[in-house]
């Protein structure tokens, strides 16, 4: 038991020392929470541009969609793949059809 407590303490102390040399991470979030259609494509495009503008280090998409138009999903997928900022997706209930295609393009699900 004492060994486990010592190990946890060492890990926490190590994390604190590593934190001094790191820059603050800017996380940009937005939702995909309706049908994948031209309006959602515009919304995602504007969100990704805003993330670049604020110099975000990470983008998190909260997704809850049953899908939609595959051509719009492909446009969103292309935007995600071409962006240099890592993008994580949090699937909050559903990512069906076009939503799954978009999720797979992200760096982490």
Where does each model-flagged region fall?
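Sec-dependent N-terminal signal peptides
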Residues: 4-13
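Soluble extramembrane regions of membrane proteins in the secretory/endomembrane system
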Residues: 19-109
